[in-house]
Curated annotation (Swiss-Prot):
Name the record gives this protein: Ribosome maturation factor RimM
Residue ranges of domain PRC barrel in the record: 94-167
Function as written in the Swiss-Prot or TrEMBL entry: An accessory protein needed during the final step in the assembly of 30S ribosomal subunit, possibly for assembly of the head region. Essential for efficient processing of 16S rRNA. May be needed both before and after RbfA during the maturation of 16S rRNA. It has affinity for free ribosomal 30S subunits but not for 70S ribosomes.
Molecular function per GO: ribosome binding
Pfam family, one: RimM
Record keywords: Chaperone, Cytoplasm, Ribosome biogenesis, rRNA processing
Source organism per UniProt: Limosilactobacillus reuteri (strain DSM 20016) (Lactobacillus reuteri)
Amino acid sequence: MEYYNVGKIVNTHGVRGEVRVLATTDFIDERFAKGNTLYLQQSGEPLPLTIESTRQHKGFVLVKFVGYDNINDVEQFRDHELMVSADDQQPLDDGQYYYHQIIGLDVETTDGRHLGKIKEILSPGANDVWVVERPEKRDLLLPVIDEVVKNVDLDKNFVTVELMEGLE
């Protein structure tokens, strides 16, 4: 089964078994809802954890898991990734994609010139930015806006872009 990151446990919170999670998902309310199962990345098979309660606190998501009732139970989870199974992913609207679908795609210009591969996605604010790794050149930062991204073809594993002046 495939798993995808939705957050990282960065610390414990209090003494009653809560953990502080830095969420990396756009679906915080859905992913961290009471009763949902998340999987803890560890060596070997991921550990399934059922959410008992969730609350927001100072930019983090505080999560309590069923059966983990004190700080000693959850201390071992610190610095581990929380994941969701591929079966539990939310359906997206047309034109929306999960990061794992975009990373690794080839990037071509509208005139057919190959630029490189998307290696990372940044989320600095108003729109995402795709980091394109180019052979023997510095990475190219592409804003994910309609004026730049013209087509995403997941079946053929490539993206067509129109470079605005100053991007390259």
